[in-house]
Curated annotation (Swiss-Prot):
GO terms for biological process: cellular response to nitrosative stress; nitric oxide catabolic process. Residues 1-20, 51-79, 155-177, 365-406 are annotated as: Disordered. It comes from Saccharomyces cerevisiae (strain ATCC 204508 / S288c) (Baker's yeast). Residues 10-20, 63-79, 384-400 have a biased composition (Polar residues). InterPro entries: Globin (IPR000971), Globin-like_sf (IPR009050), Globin/Proto (IPR012292), Mb-like_M (IPR044399). Belongs to the globin family. This is Uncharacterized globin-like protein YNL234W.
Amino acid sequence: MTGEKILHSQLLTNSDMSSGNVHHTKPMMYNVTLPSYNSSSIGPVDNLKINERPGSHDHSMRSEMSSKNSGSDFMPQSISRSEGSVYQVKIDRGDSPNTEGFDFKVNARDLLLLRMSWDILLREYLTPKELKVFQALLYSNKHITSTERPYLNTAPDGMISKTIDPTARPRKTKQRDNDNKVDTALFCSQFYDNLIAMDPLLEEYFPSLKHQAVSFCKVLDSAIDNLENVHVLDDYIVKLGKRHSRILGIKTVGFEVMGKAFMTTLQDRFGSFLTLELKNLWGQLYSYLANCMITAGKDPMEKIQPDFSYNGDSVVLNFSIPKLAMHDISTVNKLQMVKTKNATIPHNITQVPTNKIPTEILLDNSSTPIKSDRESTPPISPKGSGSTKPSIGSSTVVESNTKKNNYDEKIHLLQKTAQQKNCSIM
């Protein structure tokens, strides 16, 4: 529908619009563009897909992280305020990663405004009557009666119940139709293009970014269907938060960039119809979903009671003394100390002599010399001869009387064996 224009009836308002009171005067015909066009000079939304983008979109994620955001921008984990009938409350529930720490509530009028605007985002075109109903609701006062709002009849035969009544169709059929709308909606393509315009590297870091844009729109669609009780989606949002944090590695900064791209897409689609009230409504809803996912993605931490006391302006640390293992002294063998002339030494330790002289016995037989180096060795006389003792070199052999007989027998046996084998015993 690029380039097409349809004549819509637009209500003229007087100067009392700023005070909130809108007088519905005689409608006049204007040649206006549909909300699917951008109200700026960029032209149709199809121009978002080319490289020539407006300067407001040409900035990287790093500049988004460092810039100070205005009140209309999104800062997940920081929105905890109340504006009108829409409020988001952060409840202190410790460090538990649960979406019950946040709450989002709207009144009947704002609920209808969110659902009507979401239906406009998913549709390709609007009839003049539908646009007139949405505009009347958008610029009307919150507290005026139904008689002052002829285009917002809440009766069963009213225009709103005929066009965008969320309970008019069965639940399953409506959910299936909404999924088909989200998959093929132009809003998803615009949202994806705005993400790439903010930082082209996002497509390299997250190859499934286009699929993530469609999934994000499905999450919004589920939230819009359950605005009466958003906690129905708690389990689903907790799983999404853990997946984005632990598997995809998306941090708080990623949710901030996505929030800015979402608001830019809303501005492109609604144009001048994106009032401050409608902008705050969508901002509160996105911040609620983002805060719940960020909180659910955090790993639970064990609480430890700090061991310190606060005394005035100073903090006194109390470090506990570690307990040492105590041994029983009675079970240890006590060394019996004996006094000597030089020092006191234990009595039950065996002393090893240090001045022991090593002994060496050299035996040789030269009756049948084989090598020249053995010819100079004197022979050993056999038993019974004049020299009964073996030849001993420089060493001295000390023998006891009790072992002498056994020693002679062994020597005689060795000599006899050596003579038979013609060798000497060293």
